[in-house]
């Protein structure tokens, strides 16, 4: 317990520091003390204060919300399919969410406030299809089959998304940076709607944590302990869909955060989901803040999409983990 408390305090302190440093980084550097003044004593006549509050604060909120949502979604996904390689981007949830948003935009049905609902529905439907296909055959649903079906269907759905973008130039121009996983150009309307979806996912995740802990012992053991396996998995899927939908609607399909974060927390603290889930939210938010800072400063004055940085780090980690699993 002491170790858990210490790790939690350290990560919260790092996150607090990140929240102060992050708004100061950009084309115009603003000192941390000015950032604090803007937060605590906002002056509408001060140019730096306006830059921080009106332009950079929404981006900070987007990074925190997206990182926390992806971190918790990854932890839930790994728990429900019992596979440490489980990740929303790899298993197709992000691809399904992106296809739903892009298709709606191409048909003229998209509106920013409704984007989280579209993304959640698309991600949930594709992941449900993955689970159904993975359940086929004598061996039933296994972690390996889920991963393979997820990778295959993710590639298939991504190709459909690419085809829509090639055929519809207007949608391509509107979605190009969003599809790369970008935190720029955020607005409070979309963030506010997405926050409700994230909150619903977080509440469900915390409620399901004890049942998911018992599910790790095996379906039969969990049933013997009074856990409804089907209900737990169904509500976990709903929580994952809400979290991924919120994250994708804000920043596009950012990958590998959900893979890295639960691994870090497990190694440092515990696999107990009652501890893992809240810490995954904290570490996910911190990780995405760091990734976005690097993306914005690595090739100044140019900016990379945040999703590019997470993929550059996450893809090699995924390959290493997969290699160790197959040994």
Identify the residue ranges that each predicted region occupies.
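Alpha-helical transmembrane segments in inner-membrane proteins
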Residues: 1-327
């Amino acid at each position: 317990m002491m170790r858990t408390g210490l790790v939690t305090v350290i990560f919260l302190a790092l996150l607090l520091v990140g929240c102060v440093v992050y708004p100061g980084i950009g084309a115009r550097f603003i000192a941390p003390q000015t950032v604090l003044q803007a937060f605590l004593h906002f002056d509408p006549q001060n140019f730096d204060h306006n830059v921080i509050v009106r332009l950079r604060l929404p981006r900070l909120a987007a990074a925190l919300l997206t990182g926390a949502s992806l971190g918790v979604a990854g932890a839930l996904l790994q728990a429900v399919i019992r596979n440490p390689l489980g990740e929303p981007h790899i298993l197709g949830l992000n691809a399904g969410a992106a296809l739903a948003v892009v298709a709606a935009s191409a048909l003229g049905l998209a509106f920013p406030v409704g984007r989280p609902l579209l993304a959640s529905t698309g991600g949930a439907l594709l992941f449900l299809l993955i689970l159904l296909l993975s359940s086929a055959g004598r061996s039933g649903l296994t972690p390996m089959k889920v991963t393979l079906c997820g990778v295959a269907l993710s590639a298939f759905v991504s190709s459909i998304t690419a085809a829509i973008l090639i055929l519809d130039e207007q949608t391509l121009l509107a979605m190009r940076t969003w599809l790369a996983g970008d935190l720029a150009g955020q607005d409070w309307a979309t963030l506010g709607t997405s926050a409700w979806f994230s909150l619903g996912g977080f509440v469900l995740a915390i409620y399901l944590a004890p049942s998911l802990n018992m599910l790790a012992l095996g379906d039969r053991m969990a049933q013997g302990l009074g856990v409804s396996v089907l209900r737990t998995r169904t509500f976990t899927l709903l929580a994952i869909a809400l979290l991924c939908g919120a994250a994708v609607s804000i920043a596009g399909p950012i990958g590998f955060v959900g893979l890295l974060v639960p691994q870090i927390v497990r190694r440092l603290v515990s696999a107990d989901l009652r501890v893992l889930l809240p810490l995954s939210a904290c570490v996910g938010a911190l990780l995405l803040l760091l990734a976005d800072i690097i993306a914005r400063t690595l090739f100044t004055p140019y900016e990379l999409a945040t999703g590019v940085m997470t993929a550059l780090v996450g893809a090699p980690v995924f390959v290493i983990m997969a290699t160790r699993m197959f040994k």
